[in-house]
């Protein structure tokens, strides 16, 4: 597993993304006149997905509250000499007006065909101690915002010349099974799976809905979770990675954000035209095998 530190210390972070790591597909709709809206684009999987889609030629409008992180994403796309481009649209996904304004701004950049609902949050706590404020924040970002964004984006897709497009939702292995101390995250991911199927049911075949369920991915969210879990269970961070996160997996390494981003590239492409209501499960055997 290739890891590095952001600042020369012990903090885990993925290596910088290069063009060679990106799945590149010659899709006729992957060009700068078509827009992909990507949430959580300031870091982690959202940033990697924004970069990968821009490398494939799309105009990507990245949404996040982290303006500095969005600027870094845009600069990375420019440094890679991508065939497409990235545009920052700072927005608080818990604010309907800001979310609506961000979609309107995206529509000014071209035809919106794709939406990647990736923004996420985590809080580690048992149900009996879970703060409802954290529950509200997490479900606002990971359930309500994807629903609202889908509601706003779907008419734009239908207004294109052929009505072809897709909404990709970032689910998780926790959308398939449950572990302790993550009840709200698990609830949200199960809800996203329901939204995915509902989009497929209403998309009339050309507007698809799909989800991506990854195992443990090395993101800032995951790095924080490692520390929180170690504290909650009174074990080392190394034990969290080896035993808690990868203990059931057959591919015994954390995924990198760009590996997940490549699944969104495929899911949005014409190669995935029969991926509708379905889920791309890439978990290293975590949920489908046992000792």
Positions of predicted regions on the chain:
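Active-site loop immediately N-terminal to the catalytic Tyr-X3-Lys motif
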Residues: 128, 177-184, 252, 270
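Active-site helix of classical SDR
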Residues: 150, 188
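Residue(s) in the substrate-gating loop at a strand-loop-helix junction
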Residues: 172
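Short C-terminal tail/terminal secondary-structure segment
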Residues: 2-30, 177, 265, 270-271, ...
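Substrate-binding pocket helix/loop in short-chain dehydrogenase/reductase
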Residues: 126-127, 131-139, 245
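Short, small/polar-rich loop/turn modules that mediate ligand/substrate recognition or access, typified
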Residues: 204-208, 275-277
């Amino acid at each position: 597993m290739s890891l590095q530190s952001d600042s020369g210390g012990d903090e885990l972070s993925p290596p910088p993304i290069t063009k060679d790591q990106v799945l590149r597909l010659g899709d006729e709709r992957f060009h700068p006149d078509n827009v992909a809206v990507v949430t959580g684009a300031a870091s982690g999987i959202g940033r990697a997905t924004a970069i990968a889609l821009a490398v494939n030629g799309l105009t990507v409008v990245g949404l996040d509250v982290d303006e500095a992180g969005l600027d870094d994403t845009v600069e990375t796309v420019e440094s890679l000499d991508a065939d497409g481009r990235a545009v920052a649209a700072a927005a608080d996904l818990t604010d309907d007006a800001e979310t609506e304004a961000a979609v309107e701004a995206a529509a000014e950049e071209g035809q919106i065909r794709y939406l990647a609902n990736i923004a996420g949050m985590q809080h580690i706590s048992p149900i009996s101690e879970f703060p409802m404020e954290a529950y509200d924040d997490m479900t606002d970002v990971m359930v309500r915002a994807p629903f609202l964004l889908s509601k706003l984006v779907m008419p734009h897709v239908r207004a294109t010349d052929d009505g072809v497009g897709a909404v990709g939702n970032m689910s998780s292995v926790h959308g398939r099974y449950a572990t302790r101390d993550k009840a709200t995250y698990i609830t949200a991911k199960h809800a996203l799976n329901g939204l995915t199927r509902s989009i497929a049911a209403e998309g009339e075949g050309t507007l698809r809905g799909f989800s991506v369920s990854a195992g443990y991915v090395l993101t800032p969210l995951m790095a924080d979770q490692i520390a929180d879990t170690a504290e909650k269970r009174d074990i080392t961070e190394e034990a969290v990675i080896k035993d808690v996160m990868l203990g059931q997996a057959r591919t015994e390494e954390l995924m990198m954000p760009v590996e997940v981003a490549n699944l969104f590239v495929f899911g949005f492409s014409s190669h995935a035209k029969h991926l509708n209501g379905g889920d791309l499960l890439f978990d290293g055997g975590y949920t489908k095998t046992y000792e």
